[in-house]
Structures are given as C-alpha cells and as structure tokens.
C-alpha cells in the first residue's frame, strides 16, 4: 500500500492529480455557461450555501472513492498476517484530505470562467504552482517559511508513511477554507456588483490570513505528531528520546562549508535550509528549539 515506487496509495495520488480537476471543472462553470446560475441567485439561498453544497457533494464522492480502497484494505487485513491496519487507515485519511483540497481548488477555478476546459487547465496550473512554490524565494527567512508551507508535494505522503502531523492536517484544512472563501468572494462580487477594489482587498485579506495561520502551524513548537505504525518507524527510539531529553537549553547544529568546492558547497545554500531541517524532523519533534547554522 505505502510503497513509494508503485504502491496502491502512491499510484492513487497520481491519478487524483489528473482526475479531480476534470471532475470539478463543470461544478460552477456549467451553471455560468447555461445561465442556471441566475436561478440559484434568485432562490432564497446564499452563495456560501451554494458553494458549500457543491463541496459537500465532492466530499461524499471522495468518501465513495476511499470506500473502495477501504474494502481492499479489509480484504488484505483478513488474509495478511500482522497487517498494518492503523498505518493503512492513516494513508486513507491522507488521500481523502488530498481529494478535498483538490476539489476546493477545482471549484474555485470553475467559478472564474464559463468554459469547462479553461477551468480544468486553470486547476492544473494552480496545482503545478503549489508543487513548485516550495523552491521559490528560499533566500529570505519569512518568505521561505511561507512558500515552503504552501508547497503541496509530500503532504499526503507522510500520511501514507503512517505519520500524522498537525501541520499537514491544518494545511489541508486551511487550503480548503482558503479556496472556498475565494470562491464565495468571487460569486458575491458578481451577484452583488461589488467594486473590484473591495473584492481585491477581501481576496488579499483571506490569502494573508491563510498564509499567517500556515506559518504558525509550521513552527516546530506548534506541531503535534502521531506515529500510526506498529514499529514506530517514524519516531526516535526510546533511547534516543532519552538522550534528546537530557539536552538542556537550545541546540544549534553548525555545518562548516568549503565554499571553494563546487561539487558540494551549493548544498548549504539557503535554498536547501528547509530540506535540511526535514532531515532532523524526528529530532525537532522532541527538541523544537533546535536550529541550523552554516559557516562558510
């Protein structure tokens, strides 16, 4: 299930990337192109109810998809000795959260145009940006934290590996709320003829709030973890935890770099600070005040 080179969940992630945008491209754009959106506007329901209703339909559809995988899980649990049920269930949770995030993004892009193909292409473009943004502007401290948090790759991978982190859970929740809010703002601006400047200000405010909450959730001191594997493969051994617990005060890991070596010096550039921190994530879990320092 969790094999990164062809496991069921890993393959499912790749399919979702292409399937969900095609599924959501008509949720709002078809209403706009056919004119049926006017019927919704004239009915006694708010734009929030319209969008939340469409999102709930995608959530239910996602549950059906996950339910099929759950049946496969039950069959495997019944015939495989020492089956890692809790780990596989954690992977299912990660896939479901990924479906919800993709659906929210797709609904937003569908609300921007009456052309379904354009909505699908726009969704692919947003997903591509979220896949690449983790490597942008890594030279600046605060921006590095925000852009790296916005990056989507690997989020559901941690669930598939059996590790639940509060940062990843909040990431999906914040992304869903962000794009649903942007969709509601978009429909309100059309329905109520709101000025462009006001709509732009609301969009910027929502995006800023989402980035700020994401920045807080990514702080090591704010993270909570649960290792669902039976062998606790994602957690330090008890002996290692005892050693880390005995370290009083802060801890700084200093890396000395030979800047004249073109083959390895670039690994210590600010661009690689976040990947470096991920290597020590198991230690950061028990020593959140640990810092990295580079000497050139």
Where are these regions (language model features)?
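Long, hydrophobic alpha-helical segments
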Residues: 7-30
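Terminal transmembrane helical anchor/hairpin motif
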Residues: 1-6, 112, 119-191
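Transmembrane helix boundary and interhelical loop/hinge segments in multi-pass membrane proteins
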Residues: 23-41, 55
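Internal/C-terminal transmembrane anchor helices
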Residues: 195-221
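Hydrophobic cores of alpha-helical transmembrane segments in multi-pass inner/ER membrane proteins
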Residues: 16-22, 99-104, 169-184
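Juxtamembrane extramembrane loops of integral membrane proteins
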Residues: 219-296
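Secretory targeting signals
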Residues: 2-13, 52-116
């Amino acid at each position: 299930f969790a094999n990164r080179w062809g496991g069921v969940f890993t393959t499912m992630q790749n399919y979702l990337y292409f399937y969900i945008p095609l599924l959501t491209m008509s949720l709002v754009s078809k209403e706009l192109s056919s004119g049926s959106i006017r019927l919704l506007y004239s009915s006694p329901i708010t734009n929030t109810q319209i969008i939340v209703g469409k999102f709930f339909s995608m959530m239910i559809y996602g549950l059906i998809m996950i339910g099929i995988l759950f049946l496969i899980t039950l069959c495997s649990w019944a015939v495989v000795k020492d089956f890692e049920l809790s780990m596989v269930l954690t992977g299912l949770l990660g896939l479901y959260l990924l479906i919800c995030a993709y659906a929210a993004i797709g609904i937003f892009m569908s609300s921007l145009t009456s052309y379904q193909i354009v909505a699908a292409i726009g969704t692919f473009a947003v997903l591509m940006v979220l896949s690449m943004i983790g490597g942008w502007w890594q030279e600046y401290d605060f921006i590095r934290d925000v852009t790296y948090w916005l990056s989507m790759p690997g989020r559901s991978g941690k669930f598939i590996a059996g590790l639940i982190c509060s940062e990843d859970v909040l990431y999906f929740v914040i992304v869903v709320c962000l794009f649903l809010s942007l969709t509601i703002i978009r429909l309100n601006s059309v329905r109520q003829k709101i000025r462009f400047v006001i709509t732009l200000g609301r969009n910027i405010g929502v995006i800023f709030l989402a980035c700020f909450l994401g920045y807080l959730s990514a702080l090591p001191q704010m993270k909570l973890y649960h290792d669902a594997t039976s062998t606790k493969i994602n957690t330090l051994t008890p002996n290692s935890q005892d050693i880390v617990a005995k370290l009083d005060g802060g801890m700084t890991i200093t890396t000395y770099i030979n800047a004249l070596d073109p083959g390895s010096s670039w690994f210590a550039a600010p661009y690689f600070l976040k990947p470096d921190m991920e290597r020590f994530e198991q230690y950061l879990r028990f020593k959140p005040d640990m810092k990295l320092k580079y000497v050139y």
